[in-house]
Amino acid sequence: MTQQAANALPPVARTYQVRTYGCQMNVHDSERLAGLLEDAGYRRAADGADADVVVFNTCAVRENADNKLYGNLSHLAPRKRSEPQMQIAVGGCLAQKDRDAVLRRAPWVDVVFGTHNIGSLPTLLERARHNRAAQVEIAEALQEFPSTLPAARESAYAGWVSISVGCNNTCTFCIVPSLRGKEVDRRPGDVLAEIQTLVDQGVLEVTLLGQNVNAYGVSFAADERLREDPRMWQSAPHRNRGAFAELLRACGRIDGLERVRFTSPHPAEFTDDVIEAMAETPNVCPALHMPLQSGSDRILRAMRRSYRAEKYLGIIDRVRAAIPDAAITTDLIVGFPGETEEDFQATLDVVAASRFSSAFTFQYSKRPGTPAADMPGQLPKAVVSERYQRLIELQERISLEENQAQVGRTLELLVATGEGRKDAATARLSGRARDGRLVHFAPGAAADEPLARRAFDQVRPGDVVTTTVTGAAPHHLIADGALLTHRRTRAGDAHAAGLRPRTGVGLGIPGVGAPAPAPVTTGCAL
């Protein structure tokens, strides 16, 4: 081929890969990063292939997050030396925290961006290629609400929907508020419009996201009055305390939306109107994830958690009275500074009384910049590890007993992908019950399906089935009998066709077009 003919060929789009660490907020942010890159002309790298651009979306909650990031960056260093045209970007909470330190520890990184300016990523990548220099851009405040950005959703059947970003709490162990900023809430109409967009594309389930979802309404309650007359600030309400319950009820009026979940509420602000909305809104799932952190009132006070064990247990009692089949899960921290054996026993007592279906349990991790990092009474690792094992053993026993109580029940499952590591070996598929429990099930033909359709009606991720639980383990259920029903869905059609929902409008986000392929040279490429 002549050089002139080669130059006439369209440029090949560069490929990208996003690696995500941390919470659901980061998972959803990674969908936005993917959407931004695809809108800019990049395409997702095939599984197992080396991407031209590797983006790390990081977490800063625990020390091992630091170790994981810098370990993975070190693994990419040899490739960067041999392929200088490839690019590495680091974003998220750890980038917001470490800033220029990322380049000091990993000088082969091309772009560092923070939690407030993820929309800048395509421009920063292009600028780094053009200028042959690393770009560090950390904004101190939110530049645009992330949900206005384009998002390439991972799932055809379930979607994350942010209702707020940031947090107004001051938990002494948590670094998130300093990295994500004060709480900013989306307008209910914007939230509901995004949900409707997802449902219109076949999505059956949404999870409402916020650092403290039941504080929803804190940042927009005063706005309407202030628009009319800024002098009314003193008399304007600073909070619509019923806003989150109202939002749940509004979700119940969206046709085609079958499941609504939310994470995470704060016990200090959990009100009965939310319990009533959960119980009275059919598509709100009977599931509640509510962080406890500690069962000791003394430790809760030191954590600045603004509730005590009695209040927490009272919420659980009221939830179970209104929603008897609710599955309740939690977060727990072991080894907070100053924790005594008596404090730890109080945590065991609350866990035993709460009967959580599962718990995310962590050993306390000292995070520089948090008040807890400078507290006296930092515990030896051996003490923390021993207590952690005792807590795990208790919760594993409770989880198994709670799951064993499900044996014989008929459950509706939303068929999922990537949930069962042994599905290929066991010939099972996996799905989530309405209460969030993971169920591995035999995908045989449903009893209600005509024989002529059974070969056609293969069960697909995004479809809905009902089945009977036949076995239990601490972290999952087994259903090895024949399916009772199988409903094909638009979400299943979309998954089978490889289609992913798209949301966001990209307001104010510059498009950079498909980047031209970089020539293979020494040094950084244009």
From Swiss-Prot:
Top-rank taxon, per record: Bacteria
EC identifiers of the protein: 2.8.4.3
Transcription regulation among keywords: no
Stored SUPFAM superfamilies: Radical SAM enzymes (SSF102114)
Domain MTTase N-terminal span(s) in chain numbering: 14-130
One Pfam family cited in the UniProt record for this chain: UPF0004
Keywords: 4Fe-4S, Cytoplasm, Iron, Iron-sulfur, Metal-binding, S-adenosyl-L-methionine, Transferase, tRNA processing
Subcellular location: Cytoplasm
Keyword Iron-sulfur: yes
Textual note on the cofactor: Binds 2 [4Fe-4S] clusters. One cluster is coordinated with 3 cysteines and an exchangeable S-adenosyl-L-methionine.
Gene Ontology cellular-component terms listed: cytosol
Cofactor(s), by name: [4Fe-4S] cluster
Swiss-Prot/TrEMBL catalytic activity: N(6)-dimethylallyladenosine(37) in tRNA + (sulfur carrier)-SH + AH2 + 2 S-adenosyl-L-methionine = 2-methylsulfanyl-N(6)-dimethylallyladenosine(37) in tRNA + (sulfur carrier)-H + 5'-deoxyadenosine + L-methionine + A + S-adenosyl-L-homocysteine + 2 H(+)
Domain TRAM: 404-483
Binding site for [4Fe-4S] cluster 1: C23, C59, C93
InterPro entries: Elp3/MiaA/NifB-like_rSAM, Methylthiotransferase, Methylthiotransferase_CS, Methylthiotransferase_N, Methylthiotransferase_N_sf, MiaB_methiolase, rSAM, rSAM_horseshoe
Positions with a binding annotation for [4Fe-4S] cluster 2: C167, C171, C174
Coiled coil ranges: none
GO MF, one example: metal ion binding
NCBIfam families linked to this entry: miaB-methiolase, MiaB/RimO family radical SAM methylthiotransferase
Role: Catalyzes the methylthiolation of N6-(dimethylallyl)adenosine (i(6)A), leading to the formation of 2-methylthio-N6-(dimethylallyl)adenosine (ms(2)i(6)A) at position 37 in tRNAs that read codons beginning with uridine.
Family listed: Belongs to the methylthiotransferase family. MiaB subfamily.
Subunit annotation: Monomer.
HAMAP family linked: tRNA_metthiotr_MiaB
Name of protein: tRNA-2-methylthio-N(6)-dimethylallyladenosine synthase
